[in-house]
Each structure stands twice: as C-alpha cells, then as structure tokens.
C-alpha cells in the first residue's frame, strides 16, 4: 500500500533549527487557507486552478527556459538533495567556471531550439569578486542574443544584485527549498533567513524573482502548504515559481526516500497557481520520472513553464524533441510562438 501523501515520512537526520520563521498576521494566504486548498477534492482543486490560470494566461502558452551549469560541483554547502555538494560521493567532479564563449554557444543553441529564457547556475555558496565579473560578462552576452536572462548564484552580498541588474540580468533565482519548519532537515550550512535576505536584496535592486522549492523530500502535506504559503506571501510574490520534484541521486542523504505520490505533486502545482495567479509556474527537476500523463495534469493545474533541454545542471531531463511532441499532443503553444516580431526583439528587456 502506498503511503498517505499527507503524512509522508522523512528519512533525513535533523539539524539544529534556528529561530522560527512565521507568517505575518496580515498574510494574504494564511497557512490554514493554503492547506484547505490542498485538501479540496481533486476535481474541485483542478477546476479552481484552471479557472485561475485561464483568467491570467488566456493564451495558454508554455514558456521554455534553458538552464546551464556555468560552474559545476565542489560546493561547500550540505543541501541533502544536491549531488554537487563536495561532501557527498555522487560522482560529480568539481569544474572551473565556464569560459564566456562556451556560455554564449549554449545560449545560441537554446535560442535556436525555441527557448526564450536562459538561466545560468553556479555551485557555490556565494559569488566571489572574480566570479561575479565573469558572470556579468555572461549576462551581457546572453542579453545581446535577445534572451531573457536569469542567474542562480547562491547568496548575494550588498551591492551584488545591483551589479547584476546593471549588467542586464532580468531574473534572479533563489529558492526557499522548503517550509521553514522543515528546512533544518534539508540543510545546516545556511539559514532560512539568509535566503529571505538575499531575496530582499534582489527585489531592492529591481530584479524579477524566480523562487520556488523542492517537494518529495519527506515533508508532510502541511509542510508543502507551508512552502507555498511562504512563497505566496512574499511581497510581491515571485514572477516565476519553479516547483521541483526531488530527483534522488545516489550518495546524497535523500537517496532512497519514499517517493511522493504523483497526484500530490499535481496538487502542489494547482495550489501554487491559485495562490500566485500571475506567476509563471515552472515544472522543473524531476519531469523525466513523471511521464506524459502526470505532466499533462500539471499543465491542466496551471503549470506554464518548463526547463527545456536534456540536462538540468547535473541531472537528466526529457529530450527537447520529446517535450515539443508532448506540447503538440496536448495542443499547447510555446511562449515564443505567441510573440510578435517586435516582442521577440525586446524579449530580453
């Protein structure tokens, strides 16, 4: 018998927890209200999510975003899900940051295949000065190709977000990963407040925010609701919300954990859509293990963005041709196909 999705057990060791992070009394989406959405009958939840989706995205298009690892492995953090953490034996070797032309070649390929957003990710705690200068050059180069630019570089210090904005960055990705009350199960080398502080610096610099989390790490339904509540109550909530399904990698502490029920993942997408109606809700890691039927339900629930390309940082992803075939089967258009020529020219702006 499969486990009750609302009571998924955790196989992760507990770390000492920091001061609790709580929602303000004036929260737009109190935890109880978000949890109530999760507990709706499935058809009722899907109906409400689809109504919300159609009201805010009448074209019904799906954004294709490509993610490139510009610096792989050797990270000093201890994220329990991550094969790039240096302390875990996962077969991922540390590599130096890519050269500018390597990044631009990948961006050109992404643009040619239909992607409209290009995200650059680095496995480190935070960027050093020499790294930031290289990333700034990458951002400028990708921007000149007419792509929306996104970067995920870990925690940012004062002034770093402003520099990225000046270089032409559109979005900064910095996920919350989980609900605050589950966070100590996942990582001990960074506090939840550190993540919130970085998001504050990003927003203050005038950048758009890409922020989501990971489900299927052993959290309960209430803790999944807690993650969505944290995201929905950011003021304003993120423009992009990547929802990752845990990809279990041998050698990481989360390897072998009980998988999340697929219907519970679809519920998470639907609740994200209802609580953050104008956001691009992105199907991120874990799509290869879902199959077409679960992904189709996710699109019905309000997902309207995917990471596109055969690799996400270090883990596998569906082939680009398979993604395009699935979208065609479902009658879904890509975001690029709905843009006018003028919009395409200023896509990166």
Curated annotation (Swiss-Prot):
GO molecular function, one term: 2 iron, 2 sulfur cluster binding
Keywords per UniProt: 2Fe-2S, 4Fe-4S, Biotin biosynthesis, Iron, Iron-sulfur, Metal-binding, S-adenosyl-L-methionine, Transferase
GO BP term, example: biotin biosynthetic process
Catalytic activity: (4R,5S)-dethiobiotin + (sulfur carrier)-SH + 2 reduced [2Fe-2S]-[ferredoxin] + 2 S-adenosyl-L-methionine = (sulfur carrier)-H + biotin + 2 5'-deoxyadenosine + 2 L-methionine + 2 oxidized [2Fe-2S]-[ferredoxin]
PROSITE patterns: RADICAL_SAM
Positions of [4Fe-4S] cluster binding: 75, 79, 82
Cofactor(s) needed: [4Fe-4S] cluster; [2Fe-2S] cluster
Recorded metabolic or biological pathway in which this protein acts: Cofactor biosynthesis; biotin biosynthesis; biotin from 7,8-diaminononanoate: step 2/2
Alphabetized InterPro entries for the sequence: Aldolase_TIM, BATS_dom, Biotin_synth/BioAB, Biotin_synthase, Elp3/MiaA/NifB-like_rSAM, rSAM
Record-listed [2Fe-2S] cluster binding positions: 119, 150, 210, 282
Free-text remark on how the cofactor is bound: Binds 1 [4Fe-4S] cluster. The cluster is coordinated with 3 cysteines and an exchangeable S-adenosyl-L-methionine. Binds 1 [2Fe-2S] cluster. The cluster is coordinated with 3 cysteines and 1 arginine.
Domain (Radical SAM core) ranges: 60-287
SUPFAM superfamilies: Radical SAM enzymes
EC number: 2.8.1.6
Family named by the database record: Belongs to the radical SAM superfamily. Biotin synthase family.
Function: Catalyzes the conversion of dethiobiotin (DTB) to biotin by the insertion of a sulfur atom into dethiobiotin via a radical-based mechanism.
Assembly and binders: Homodimer.
Protein known as: Biotin synthase
